[in-house]
A protein has these predicted regions:
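Positively charged, solvent-exposed patches that mediate nucleic-acid binding
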Residues: 1-116
Length: 116
């Protein structure tokens, strides 16, 4: 699990990130990125899977867990904790990502981050 300081929590933070509209897409994962106004705030991340993707919460939550874990592992591998970029990121899972394995989702997350 990501430490609390690295998570987007409020609806206003999610909306502000969506408004900036810097985005990239790969394999059923879309990434929206925004720049934080305050420079003392580290990069914060949120994960979203809407009811349009699947009506069952179990499926949506599983996809969110896979997205979270793949992002966390990429941070650990690349030693990006405490990076000097002041971003807010929102990963949005789509229907295409539902049946994929962890490795496929991890590659999709990696590609979206590289495109950014």
């Amino acid at each position: 699990m990501l430490p609390k300081q690295y998570r987007l929590k409020k609806r206003t933070a999610f909306k502000a990130t969506y408004k900036v509209r810097h985005s990239s897409h790969s394999g059923g994962v879309t990434l929206f990125a925004g720049i934080e106004k305050k420079e003392d705030i580290p990069t914060r991340v949120g994960f979203v899977v809407s009811k349009k993707v699947h009506k069952r919460a179990v499926k949506r939550n599983r996809l969110k867990r896979l997205l979270r874990e793949s992002y966390r592992q990429l941070l650990k591998e690349n030693n990006l904790y405490g990076s000097d970029k002041f971003l807010s990121l929102v990963f949005v899972g789509s229907e295409n990502a539902l049946g994929k394995s962890f490795d496929e989702i991890k590659n999709s997350v990696k590609k979206t981050l590289e495109k950014l």
